[in-house]
Amino acid sequence: MAIFRNALSRSLPELDTGPQGQPILVQNKESPEGWAPKLTESSPITKVYKRRWIIVTLFCLYSMSNAYQWIHLNIIANIITKYYNASLPEDRFQRETTVDWLSMIYMLAYIPLIFPSTFLLNKKGLRVCALAGAFLNALGAWLKVACISPDRFAILMFAQTVCAIAQIFILGLPAKIAAVWFGPNEVSTATSLGVFGNQVGVAIGFLVPPILVPNSDSLDQIGDDLSIMFYAGAGYMTLLFILVIIIFKERPPHPPSKAQMLALQNVHEEHYGRSLLNLFKNVGFDILTITYGVNTGCYYAISTLLNPIILDYFPGHEESAGQIGLTIVIAGVGGSIAAGIWLDRTRTYKGTTLGIYFLSMAGMVAFTFTLDLSLLWVVFLCAGALGFFMTGYLPVGFEFAAEITYPESEGTSSGLLNASAQFFGIILTIGCRAMINKVGTLGSNILISGTLLLGTICTGFIAADYRRQEAGKEILDQMDNVMQIEISEKESEKSRIAEPRSRDNQI
């Protein structure tokens, strides 16, 4: 607790002495961006603005478009392999793994670039990162338009790499947007909405490509279908970039919560490298980084390899593979929102994290052993349960990290969580692809189930150290003390004024 008090004392307004030597709070002249606490006459101004819903909606839309570009090629991996076969390796494993890299490049690009992008987020703020992400997202989409030829897989990979760089400026923003724009009882819900946009994009990426680009023996027909898909995507993402330029703002005129006001001051005072060091010294956050990476990495591996997993049991069902992916994501959207609302009401971060992790593992086991039944409706049901809990874990992990690492920047902690997810996503995708080719799909699914079991066990060792909640309680206590002092002083002053009058009346 002493650590939290020291952090608060550095970021609270200065104390001065008022009448009768009592301490009163005065304005901190060095507070940035006009968010200085003014407690000499009243409480600090905190306010939520209606614009916050426009900001989070716009973020959801362009996050959705980037997530769509992540998976829209791999859900039709067999068709992409057929069309670009002339520019792919001859060896089967290398050829399939090369196509898998259209998804894994998102994971690979994130790992080395997360640190400079997080530094940019902390130094330049939300608007700069939003502009960078939206611009690169649109640029990558237009580059794909130039890839319509069987010998241009290298250009397609380059375009996908540009989109992968764009997501670096997107994935770390939900918790930051929630903290900067939303009130204390809306933070978890807002974070869930931020993740919601990303998941809707994945859902569209699963559903639409198998419909727009059906399997065909004619390469010309496949090329025409790909062209329609790429042009439509490029136009939509260009519109979003223009909207971000016009609408997206850095922060509201006043902070939405007292905790955010204090956190903002600390971000300006603390060095980014020192913030990273503080996070790495936090054992609970270290464990959470690994377990979050494992859970989300499993989700990435399943999403990337869903096409071969489903086609192994249901040949020729490309559209069913996309619909199963859609089911996973839609159920996950419900899970994300439900988890956010649950956290806002209960604040039971560790218990919720552990419970969802265990249920994710149970859902994966059910999915694994129902594929053999050859009943698509059962597969859809189990996929929905898997998605509800596995995707519902994403915002819970962000918020748990923000709680146990306060007052460090939410952008930094969520960025490290995402970097871990990308790392484990690459390892698990390559490992599962090798298992599919050498052992079979069952072995691949068992590998993911076992990995989730290990992650569940490790999650139990994370301490429930809710620093953000404690900080909020302490600042409210200090404000109550200040208000009591001011009330006491006013009553004393009234008494001193009233005494001479009563004497005059007696005379």
Language model features by range: what are they?
Residues 157-197:
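Cytoplasmic helix-loop-helix junction between adjacent transmembrane helices
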Residues 73-74, 282-334, 394, 428:
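Extracytoplasmic gate region of multi-pass secondary transporters
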Residues 347-397:
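C-terminal transmembrane helical hairpin of 12-TM major facilitator-type secondary transporters
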Residues 186-214, 237, 418-428:
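Glycine-rich segments within core transmembrane alpha-helices of 12-TM secondary carriers
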Residues 112-153:
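Conserved MFS/SLC helix-loop-helix module at the cytosolic interface between two early adjacent transmembrane helices
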Residues 112-126, 335-348, 436:
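Helix-to-loop junctions at the C-terminal end of transmembrane segments
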Residues 227-246, 443-461:
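Symmetry-related core transmembrane helices of the 12-TM Major Facilitator Superfamily/SLC fold
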Residues 2-68, 73:
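Cytosolic juxtamembrane N-terminal segment immediately preceding the first transmembrane helix
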